[in-house]
């Protein structure tokens, strides 16, 4: 991959990490997050796999914009929860792709549609105008095409790409005074924290089994259980399940022959990161995916430093 795009990916992830976990943290959490940040960096260097630039094509851009538009219509129009909306769009995209049987415009449309859906989860307290969110979804689709040879098999790539698209579009929206003050973060109770950790541990494993053992594919493996959980769980906890499912989208060749200890470690980190997430501007679409990617890179970085790449 050309260096500017590699630096852009690293830069956006760094900004996300600093804003979400480091800035304003007390001393002990600050030291812990700083150490974890070094492990994330090690994982990024060992597993970023920045290959050549991907092919430019309007199809993923349009499909991602459709995903963002669908979630916007469901959330801001029909007042469906953002988790339920994104999961529903992901399920539909994955099923349509499977029905296309590898031909036609939807032969690989599930990933860009899901990526665009994450951009569409952006809160109206962050970006008020749906037009800017739609532009962020389209940009996410463009970036996904350009970055097709990077982060292959890394859980959280789709969400991180959506986050990048929304942030870059948000910078332009801010210049036009269209940026809000940010959404309010949910304060988890003691009981909710227990459920949060349980969800963060279970979701990656279930997603990984559905995606790779049952061969449903990563989009349906993530979206289907997330849709079910979103029907029965409060939105903040359903969001944790959805984010944990992104961890489970990590490909087997990124893990060892025994993937589940790594997935549990990644899920636990995702849960802890979710509890410590305090960004200056909450509610940006794709932040769950970026948190998942940070968790995946941290565990992969630890394993790379201790044992080298997976055997």
Where do the PLM segments sit?
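C-terminal transmembrane helix-loop-helix hairpin of multi-pass membrane proteins
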Residues: 1-42, 53-65, 71-72, 77-87, ...
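Glycine-rich, hydrophobic membrane-spanning regions of integral membrane proteins that mediate transport
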Residues: 48-52
